[in-house]
């Protein structure tokens, strides 16, 4: 059974296409820039870009805001806090924190697809304080500890 989520189009986003999957096999719904006219991201600059939407997700789900691969690969534009998390109980406007990692200015126009929103299941656990935790072969090996081969 397919889950349903409610979407609220804010006044500054009513004329934009609602998020949708670009193809039958897509994992992410495309989010669009709900800005007036255009904006320019200078190299190294980041900006919160409004999408003009609010969502109400069913319990047990979250929305992850992820970069669009084409923007990252071709222009160095990505989501700064990737993946951004939209909690199930958040009801405000979804905004995307875009950053320009390239050496060139990048212009975002109204209606441009700027990120993708992936809906995922969430599990919550109860943390119990302990005096010790179990041993593993890896132990406390951290970044790069398992090698590259």
Swiss-Prot record:
Cofactor (UniProt): Mg(2+)
Biological processes annotated in GO: dUMP biosynthetic process; dUTP catabolic process
EC number annotated for this UniProt entry: 3.6.1.23
Binding positions (substrate): 68-70, 81, 85-87, 95
Keywords for this protein: Hydrolase, Magnesium, Metal-binding, Nucleotide metabolism
InterPro entries found in the cross-reference section: dUTPase, dUTPase-like, dUTPase-like_sf, dUTPase_trimeric
Uppermost EC category: hydrolase
Pathway(s) per entry: Pyrimidine metabolism; dUMP biosynthesis; dUMP from dCTP (dUTP route): step 2/2
Reaction catalysis annotation: dUTP + H2O = dUMP + diphosphate + H(+)
Molecular functions per Gene Ontology: dUTP diphosphatase activity; magnesium ion binding
Family according to the record: Belongs to the dUTPase family.
Function: This enzyme is involved in nucleotide metabolism: it produces dUMP, the immediate precursor of thymidine nucleotides and it decreases the intracellular concentration of dUTP so that uracil cannot be incorporated into DNA.
Identification of the protein by name: Deoxyuridine 5'-triphosphate nucleotidohydrolase
Designated gene of the protein: dut
């Amino acid at each position: 059974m397919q889950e349903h989520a409610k979407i609220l189009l804010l006044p500054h986003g009513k004329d934009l296409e609602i998020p949708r999957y670009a193809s039958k096999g897509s994992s992410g719904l495309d989010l669009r820039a709900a800005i007036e006219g255009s904006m320019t991201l200078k190299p190294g600059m980041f900006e919160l870009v409004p999408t003009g939407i609010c969502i109400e997700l069913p319990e047990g789900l979250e929305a992850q805001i992820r970069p669009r691969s084409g923007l990252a690969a071709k222009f160095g534009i990505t989501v700064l806090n990737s993946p951004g998390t939209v909690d199930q109980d958040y009801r405000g406007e979804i905004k995307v924190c875009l950053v320009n990692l390239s050496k060139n200015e990048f212009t975002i126009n109204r209606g441009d697809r700027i990120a993708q929103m992936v809906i995922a299941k969430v599990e919550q656990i109860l943390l119990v304080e302990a005096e010790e935790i179990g041993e593993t072969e890896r132990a406390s090996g951290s970044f790069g500890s398992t090698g590259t081969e």
